[in-house]
Amino acid sequence: MEINKLQVEAIKSGSVIDHIPEYIGFKLLSLFRFTETEKRITIGLNLPSKKLGRKDIIKIENTFLSDEQINQLAIYAPHATVNYINEYNLVRKVFPTLPETIDRILICPNSNCVTNHHLINSSFILKEDQFFNMNLKCKYCEKEFYKKIVLSCQ
């Protein structure tokens, strides 16, 4: 008989971002500005996972992520799930899907891009090349980059 024990304390109401690849949890806290709130946030790092081997998890009390926020998670955590909790019960489970654009959370690798010199939020259009590689095109400088290059700038 397998005993399930919570590695991170349960929340009464709010959002749980589960199945985050290991070492990505802190990055998501920063990029999505989750720490700019008065709400209690609990994070678990390098937890055992059957799916991933190791995973991170973020629990945000009394906060429900928007569909836009959930889908933007997919660029970093494509297999994550977002669980909405109410009265300690799961009321909705959402699987992120890549949006057509990613706004505000990425930095353009082009040092000459206006977003790197002025208070302008970045915006990238997601594109796939003929080999199904994910590329991101900056809305402002119009340069296109491999996903790996953009994510390494963060």
Swiss-Prot record:
What does the record say about how the cofactor binds?
Binds 1 zinc ion per subunit.
- Might you report a single GO cellular component term? aspartate carbamoyltransferase complex
Gene name per UniProt: pyrI
Instruction: State the oligomer form and interacting partners.
Output: Contains catalytic and regulatory chains.
The Gene Ontology biological process terms listed for this entry are: 'de novo' pyrimidine nucleobase biosynthetic process; pyrimidine nucleotide biosynthetic process
Keyword Transmembrane carried by entry: no
Q: Which cofactor does it need?
A: Zn(2+)
Q: Print the keywords alphabetically.
A: Metal-binding, Pyrimidine biosynthesis, Zinc
Listed name of the protein: Aspartate carbamoyltransferase regulatory chain
What exactly does this protein do? Involved in allosteric regulation of aspartate carbamoyltransferase.
**What InterPro entries does this protein map onto?**
Asp_carbamoyltransf_reg_N (IPR020545), Asp_carbamoylTrfase_reg (IPR002801), Asp_carbamoyltrfase_reg_C (IPR020542), Asp_carbatrfase_reg_C_sf (IPR036792), Asp_carbatrfase_reg_N_sf (IPR036793)
Q: Which residues bind Zn(2+)?
A: 108, 113, 138, 141
Q: Note the HAMAP family from the entry.
A: Asp_carb_tr_reg
Molecular function terms from GO = metal ion binding
